[in-house]
């Protein structure tokens, strides 16, 4: 899994350290919603059943480099 330096840095935060790489890969492959930001970055969401929360993964425009990943408390599935 390709990542940015920013992601590698934020991954050290306690709330982010518990996010499993398998969950990130799941979101990338099985999003319930996808949005493209004006800067070309791609946001994807999927529910992680183990924690009953929605994980948002932000990818660079290449569609494979992870820039950020966190549980999105405000996400509501359409």
Region spans (language model):
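Ribonuclease/tRNase effector modules and their secretory precursors
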Residues: 1-78
């Amino acid at each position: 899994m390709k990542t940015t330096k920013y992601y590698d840095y934020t991954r050290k935060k306690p709330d982010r350290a518990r996010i499993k790489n398998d969950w990130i890969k799941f979101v990338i492959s099985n999003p319930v919603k996808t949005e493209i930001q004006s800067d070309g970055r791609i946001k994807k969401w999927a529910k992680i059943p183990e924690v009953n929360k929605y994980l948002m993964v932000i990818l660079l425009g290449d569609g494979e480099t992870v820039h950020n990943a966190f549980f999105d408390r405000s996400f509501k599935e359409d």
